[in-house]
Amino acid sequence: MSDIRHVWIRLPILGCYVFLIGLMPVAQTTGQAEPGEHDGNVVTEWNAIAQNAIVTVGAQPIQRSQLWMTLVHVAIYDAVTSIDGQYEQFKVTPAHLRPASRDAAAIAAAHGILVSLLPSQQASLDAARENSLSAIRDGARKNNGIAIGEEVASRLLEIHDGVIPTVAYTPGLGPGVWQPTPPAFANALLPGFAQVTPFALASASQFRPGPPPALSSSMWTRDFDEVKSFGVATGSLRTPEQTEIGRFYTEHAVAQYSRAFRRYAIENGLDVQKTARFFAMANTAILDSQIACWDAKFHYNFWRPVTAIRAGDTDGNPATAPDAGWIGLAITPPHPEYPAAHGCWTSATARILELFNGTNVVHFALDSAVTGTTHVFETVDDLRAEIINARVYGGMHFRNSVEVGATIGEHVADWVAFGFRARRGQNEEEDRRRR
């Protein structure tokens, strides 16, 4: 697998931009299977149960799925860490019941969140709970663990109810303004997601970026021409490898990344405490990055490539030639373009991997149900670089928008990680720095 870097050269003779493509190895494509769920622990087990309930059976959109998945894993984390005592609770500190089973607490916490959010699935979720709890010996430890998990779930839902506000939104008109995109021309997706209270950030606008490039700028011309040439469905300048990258990340992101997180936890032998912390950090960083991204998207309301390229003669820039029939490789999601949500999402993931491990050198595998392939990344920089290219190859985004999204994701992850720190006094240097 390779990362494709584009170098732009102005050729006066041709009067157009030509791309010189250099190759930098970043990932391998393999056919390796995901480790079996029995190889993990109760956290990976209930992540898979949550994925099935929320995404597969519940058929929830990505943003609501991520909100609910974060509730599940913050509940698990607070329940487990209240027993272990090494880390501060993130949202809820339950009653001090001892002795207590971490596994029972995690199971009860996850179950409590899911049945509240998905009452129609109560029977199957209750059965999953009983099956998981059956592996734990009856007694005070089990009972106390269950009580802790149930308390955490109930109290967390009082803080974050998992509801996305309904907000009226009317698309604008004119150059640079988002409009519904083909083929479905669907209404904007969940504009109220920008008003969901973040789990860690002070506000959704905390890391709001500056505006997208002016339509008269050289950056706009560069990005317009790049996605027009590399992101088009047919007749593009993409290599087969680049086409695979463009399609790879078009799966439901919560399903795709949940599988990757389970694989990572299992392959690295993380115990229940470490798995709970990793899943809570990663999911919270992703969620808050998406809320921040939605805030910026619906603040700037920037148009998508498919709209911009079809109307290239309306932007006041003589260097952006229109193509009235242009359509991207992937279906454009129904929300404004700037910044790119997957840039925020994947960069937040990459930064959490780096902070969790204390190094940017990782072995992180993502598979795609769309392409049937697996990409293995040895550094977080490789993961971040590939998503920037992928959204351009898919025809959904301009390069600058993905880069800006990646910056947001990194900032959000740094902020989120502080909430999952060791108990006060174990990291006095960081405590002083943040005060």
Where does each model-flagged region fall?
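Bacterial N-terminal signal peptides
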Residues: 12-25
